[in-house]
Regions:
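Short acidic/polar N-terminal linker immediately downstream of export determinants
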Residues: 5-10, 15, 19-83, 94-117, ...
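Conserved small/polar residues in nucleotide/adenosyl-binding loops
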Residues: 290-295
Length: 297
């Protein structure tokens, strides 16, 4: 009986912890304002907005973007006493999604569904999540996470793609086609880009984060500063350069030429049979069976 009681107590504690993990608290401004606790009555509200080509998300909402022609749309699903505390507006061609100033709220669910014909920028500041619902076709686009938020979406076709993480957030995407790809991870975040086709790629990791790339590129420049890792052994490049400063690692694949420079205890592993320009230490050849997915595990 005592064992059963202990088991029930642990189960209730686990349930309580899970429930609490779904609770979001957001404060804009000072700490003097009273916290508004979300009701259990959920509503859907349409918000009229002007045309925009960039998206900026603050706080911790769940945002889904759908690319479609016609007028832009914004639909909010949340508690009825929370919806009017939101600040959703377009300024300088950017759709801002957040809360009004001097607001303190506690809520479980906040979904914002957005559609527009064109998008050239996505910025998440905080713990919010953004999902590209049906892919994205555009010219140049900049995608960034600052904080612990996440961005996900597949089937991106563009001219130039600048994608970055500053903090502990994550970015995941598959099926990317672009001319110029700029990848940056600063902090402890993780970025995973699968099935990429690019002409030129520059990827850097600063801190303890991880970047994983697969696909192909004509030319690549890789750099790691700190203890982070850059896994590109499944990202085939004709020409590549790899530089490590610190204890981090780079794993890459080059077919024609590979230049390597290391300082510290870091190293560079490679696939392929390229012409090599490398120092006496810090370079080793990967086995043919090695994959970035194995490194991710």
């Amino acid at each position: 009986m005592k064992a059963l009681t202990t088991f029930i107590a642990i189960a209730l504690l686990a349930f309580s912890t899970t429930a609490c993990s779904q609770q979001h608290t957001y404060r804009s401004g000072g700490f003097g304002s009273k916290t508004v606790k979300a009701s259990k009555n959920y509503v859907t509200k349409d918000i009229k907005v002007d045309n925009f080509t960039k998206l900026s998300v603050a706080g911790s909402p769940d945002v889904t973007y759908t690319q479609k022609s016609g007028k832009p749309t914004v639909e909010v699903y949340t508690s009825d006493n929370i919806v009017d505390l939101l600040d959703i507006r377009v300024k300088d061609n950017t759709l801002y999604i957040g809360f009004k100033k001097n607001v303190s709220v506690s809520y479980n669910k906040l979904e914002v569904r957005v559609s527009a014909e064109k998008l050239n920028g996505i910025a998440v500041a905080g713990s919010g999540d953004v999902e590209l619902k049906n892919g994205l076709k555009t010219d140049d686009i900049k995608i960034s996470v600052a904080g612990s938020g996440d961005i996900s979406g597949n089937n991106i076709s563009c001219t130039d793609l600048d994608i970055s993480i500053a903090g502990s957030g994550d970015i995941n995407s598959s099926n990317i086609t672009c001319n110029d790809l700029q990848v940056s991870v600063a902090g402890s975040g993780d970025m995973k880009l699968n099935n990429v086709t690019a002409n030129f790629t520059r990827a850097s990791v600063a801190g303890s984060g991880t970047a994983i790339l697969s696909g192909s590129t004509q030319e690549a420049e890789y750099s790691v500063a700190g203890s982070g890792d850059l896994f590109a052994s499944d990202f085939v490049a004709k020409k590549a350069s790899a530089s490590v400063a610190g204890s981090g690692d780079i794993k890459c694949h080059a077919t024609d030429f590979l230049k390597v420079r290391t300082s510290g205890s870091g190293s560079v592993g490679y696939k392929g049979n390229p012409e090599l320009d490398y120092p006496k230490k810090g370079l080793y050849k990967l086995c043919l069976l090695y994959t970035s997915d194995a490194a991710d595990e």
